[in-house]
Amino acid sequence: LTTPVRRRVRQFLPWALASIAAVFAILTFVWFVNPPTVESEAAQPTDAVVVFAGNPARLETAVELMENGVAPYLVIPNGNTSDVGTNLCEEQASFEVFCPDTEEISTWGEAQEIGRLALGRGWSRLTAVTSVYHVHRATTLLRRCYEGEIEVVTPQRDIDSEWVGKVGHEWIGLLASIVLYPTC
């Protein structure tokens, strides 16, 4: 490269990198820190509450929603893979619990199974429960498999010391879902 071209590249490069970093920071905030969700107390009635696998706080939030009468059905894909989930799947509750096994133990597998179940039962409105950092990827995949309305509730702001690693995982998972799972 000639000297004037190099000079222009050196002048442009910091601005380009700063712009990319700014876009990345904004998307991270909107998608993984402050996504659109509803407080559990304000959740509207839906056909079912669906839980994406993860920490016990998600299941506790889902049970709270069920006890508040948000929906008649609770869906816990791969629910028998955790102690709390197994208890809900095997014990009698005041609401009906579905614990389907998925073909793939992943957010995509869960979205597929939730979509199949919702279609088969004629559900048109769901309440999805997941962690705040997982909302964007979970709803992106669920919308590929389910055409109805989705309201999202998260456990009380569950951002903790491991949050940075979780957001990194979600970025990788989101990019993988775009490439590997473009459709349901």
List the predicted regions and their residue ranges.
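Perimembrane helix-loop junctions in membrane proteins
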Residues: 35-38, 180-184
